[in-house]
UniProtKB/Swiss-Prot annotation:
This is Clusterin. GO terms for biological process: positive regulation of apoptotic process; positive regulation of proteasomal ubiquitin-dependent protein catabolic process; positive regulation of receptor-mediated endocytosis; protein stabilization; regulation of cell population proliferation. GO terms for molecular function: misfolded protein binding. It holds the Pfam family Clusterin. It comes from Coturnix japonica (Japanese quail).
Length: 451
């Protein structure tokens, strides 16, 4: 601190009519008493950061177990999809069986499918009916009843959903990594205080504190973080912006997506043309029909002749085909079950991250300020320096009341700060410096914590 600045502060107080209470040689004792309080608060904050680190390490272990479960579920899902594709291919090679019966039904099924699909599209979607109608007619003309007979669009559903799950997983994984890195940064910055500033951390019971939290094997990041890291770059500059904010927008976005996704999964498109529709589902249906006319095949249950195609039994002509179809259906059901399981696991992981990030934010708001002291060097006189103690001008409305005391301090590397202590607490009362140190630290926290 520059001496001219202190002189000006002291002069300013004297000019206001204040009276010096403490001789200069006593200021060091007050500084030492205040620094003792600050040291205890810093120690408490570092222990709070330790709680953050412990929580994050525990979460990381649970995360690794979750990754293993996700990988196992994904593997089983992919095996079931692969089997379904193989059975579909084998069925396609035998589609000439019962071909005459199904072709006849197909010619009556197509007009109904087109009419039903366009009716739903016109009701849900704002524009593009003419183009969609032409695309749908071309699609139906080059398709065969086999598409309906084997429920082929269910495989398309599985493949599309797999892509969405992969994107969602990558997003979650990257955000988890950012949270993990943020906690690690706060911890590492806090541990910079060990050394000249806090030599007691080098001896029991604090000895080995830092080393105890250095993992023997660094976590392997499964997903490149470049894309999302750029989007969330401000988080690295100001980690106190909030861990919870990493996951809350993603949770809301995913909730909308899943609400629509499950609706499409559980109901045929024809079922969307009801009063229970919602706008997110409508948008999804419109987009799907515009992108892929095959989505209209879901409406087969709305058309009698299409339902009859589903009921065609070719077992008398070719028992093997009937067996293949049964195997195909079994594989599809299994793949759908594992797909739902994977979604549930991702949702559980995301909910856990919301809870953990909220708790980390609470700890960070309470203790994270200590990480701002990482590059600070403590002098021989401690972190809190008392520069002036003056009695303020008595209250004219109550002259008999003791005048408040004005104290000027400097805490850490902050600017000098003027604080007021009630007049009934004298400067030699132990509570005096506790009040001063507490006020100074509270002011520092407010200016160094980003809500």
């Amino acid at each position: 601190m520059e001496l001219p600045l202190l002189a000006l502060l002291s002069l300013g107080l004297v000019c206001q009519g204040g009276q010096g209470l403490v001789p200069p040689n006593e200021l060091k004792q007050l500084s030492a008493a205040g620094s003792k309080y600050i040291d205890a608060e810093v120690e408490n904050a570092i222990n709070g950061v330790k709680q953050m680190k412990t929580l994050m390490d525990k979460t990381s272990k649970e995360h690794q177990a979750m990754l293993h479960t996700l990988e196992e579920t994904k593997k089983k899902k992919e095996e079931a999809v692969k089997l379904a594709l193989e059975k579909e291919k084998q069925l396609a090679e035998k589609q000439e069986v019962c071909n005459e019966t199904m072709l006849s039904l197909w010619e009556e099924c197509k007009p109904c499918l087109k009419h039903t699909c366009m009716r739903v599209y016109s009701k849900m979607c704002h524009s593009g009916s003419g183009l969609v109608g032409r695309q749908l007619e071309e699609f139906l003309n080059r398709s065969s009843p086999f598409s309906i007979w084997v429920n082929g669009e269910r495989i398309d559903d599985l493949l599309d959903r797999e892509q969405r799950q992969e994107r969602r997983f990558e997003d979650l994984e990257e955000r988890f990594g950012l949270m993990e890195d943020g906690v690690e940064d706060i911890f590492q910055d806090s541990t910079q205080l060990y050394g000249p500033a806090f030599p007691f951390f080098r001896t029991p019971p604090f000895g080995g504190f830092r080393e105890a939290f250095v993992p023997p094997v660094q976590r392997v990041h499964l997903v490149p973080r470049r894309r999302l890291s750029r989007e969330l770059h401000p988080f690295f500059q100001h980690p106190m912006h909030g861990f919870h904010r990493l996951f809350q927008p993603l949770f809301e976005m995913t909730q909308h997506m899943l609400d629509g996704g499950h609706g499409a999964w559980e109901h045929p498109l024809g079922g969307f043309a009801t009063e229970s529709r919602n706008f997110s589902t409508d948008r999804m249906v419109c987009r799907e029909i515009r992108r892929n006319s095959a989505g209209c095949l879901r409406m087969r249950d709305e058309c009698e002749k299409c339902r009859e195609i589903l009921a065609v039994d070719c077992s008398q002509t070719d028992p093997v085909q009937s067996q293949l179809r049964e195997q195909f259906e079994d594989a599809l059901r299994l793949a759908e079950r594992f797909t739902r399981r994977y979604d549930d696991l991702l949702s559980a992981f995301q909910a856990e991250m919301l809870n953990t990030s909220s708790l980390l934010d609470q700890l960070n708001r309470q203790f994270g300020w200590v990480s701002r002291l990482g590059n600070l060097t403590q002098g021989n006189d401690g972190f809190l320096q008392v520069t002036t103690v003056f009695s303020k001008t008595p209250n004219l409305e109550d002259p008999s009341a003791p005048a408040d005391t004005q104290v000027t301090v400097q805490l850490f590397d902050s600017e000098p700060l003027s604080l007021t202590v009630p007049g009934d607490i004298s400067w030699d009362d132990p509570r005096f410096m506790e009040i001063v140190a507490e006020q100074a630290l509270q002011h520092y926290k407010q200016n160094n914590t980003i809500e």
